[in-house]
Amino acid sequence: MKFGPVPLARAEGAILAHATQAGARRIKKGTRLGEDEIAALREAGIAEVAAAVLDPGDLDENEAARRIAAALKSRGVEVRDAATGRVNLHAGKAGVFCVDRALIDAINAVDPAITVATLNDHVRVEPGRMVATVKIIPFAVAGTLVDAVEAIAARGAVFGVHPFTARRVALIQTSLPGTKPSVLDKTVKTMRARLEPSGSAIAFERRTPHDEASLARAL
């Protein structure tokens, strides 16, 4: 990729480095310049633009991010659309996010132009939570770098969301003579809230005196 001033006559296909006002039209940073954009710039009296010109074999930031995200995609993870060189990946279900840190470190060591960030290992996630993001720093990268990342990702599951399995739960509470029923009621409420993210529920609850014989009978 070559970056710098580019005459309009050679700017078609280049990636605009800065947002540029062309008459009544504002052309956004990162736009791949086509015939319409070139015409608008020329009509506005602009002779050259700051832009990135891709070399043969280069991939623009969005295509590179899409390919890497596709290589990383695994069970329980959904890939969102690419924009400004970034693709976010989100949990498709509630569960536990697991990541192979060694593989992530290897990917991030390929080149500073390519970064992948994730949540920590063994984090509980809900559906829709962002678990990872792929970011291409420059406007384009060499396709060989993306090939290298794909090769690392092919070594094994880089990350994924292991969905919870819903369970029916029995809750047995013991109480001392001075224990208030409201305290036990609060415990039930708290337990239900903890079980809800996994789709689990309290099937039945039993309360018994706080002694070994009573607890044994309850069990």
Residue ranges of model-derived segments:
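Short, low-complexity N-terminal leaders and the immediately following helix N-cap/first helix
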Residues: 1-84
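A conditional alpha-helix N-cap/helix-loop micro-motif detector
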Residues: 31, 109-114, 208-212
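Amphipathic coiled-coil/heptad-repeat helices and related helical stalk/stem segments
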Residues: 34, 214-215
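Short, glycine/charged-enriched secondary-structure capping and boundary segments
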Residues: 41, 147-148, 184-187
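Extended, charged alpha/beta regions that create polyanion-binding interfaces
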Residues: 55-164
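Glycine-rich phosphate/diphosphate-binding loop of Rossmann-like nucleotide-binding domains
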Residues: 155-210, 214
